Curated annotation (Swiss-Prot):
Assembly description: Core subunit of respiratory chain NADH dehydrogenase (Complex I) which is composed of 45 different subunits. Interacts with TMEM186. Interacts with TMEM242.
Catalytic activity: a ubiquinone + NADH + 5 H(+)(in) = a ubiquinol + NAD(+) + 4 H(+)(out)
Subcellular location, record wording: Mitochondrion inner membrane
Pfam families named in the record: Oxidored_q4 (PF00507)
Segments traversing the membrane: 3-23, 55-75, 87-107
Keyword Transmembrane helix on entry: yes
Superkingdom, taxonomy of origin: Eukaryota
Protein name in UniProt: NADH-ubiquinone oxidoreductase chain 3
Function: Core subunit of the mitochondrial membrane respiratory chain NADH dehydrogenase (Complex I) which catalyzes electron transfer from NADH through the respiratory chain, using ubiquinone as an electron acceptor. Essential for the catalytic activity of complex I.
GO biological process, alphabetically ordered: mitochondrial electron transport, NADH to ubiquinone
GO molecular function terms listed in the Swiss-Prot or TrEMBL record: NADH dehydrogenase (ubiquinone) activity
Amino acid sequence: MNLVIALLINTGLATILVMVAFWLPQLYTYLEKSSPYECGFDPLGSARLPFSMKFFLVAITFLLFDLEIAILLPIPWASQTSSPYSLLSLSGVLLALLTLGLAYEWLQKGLEWTE
């Protein structure tokens, strides 16, 4: 019961803080706040540069594969199995899944940088 009360209080407090953090800055908008800051100088050009969607997709793909490798590395220590064959089969399945994902991205031309 104490755990439920603590979780509800923490969830409520976090929700209130997030709402205040999003709504409070929107109340006071003025020119200096909405213009780009360039070390005290007047802005020379537009601060809104076009963003390459291809770069974004390659970056997200890299992050996904990097996260999967980070999950794969501690498997020998995190696994509670006594048999090394089950550990090798689990690692093999994860590596096969990574390889299939990479092959799919390659075939869909998700790794090519040409615009």
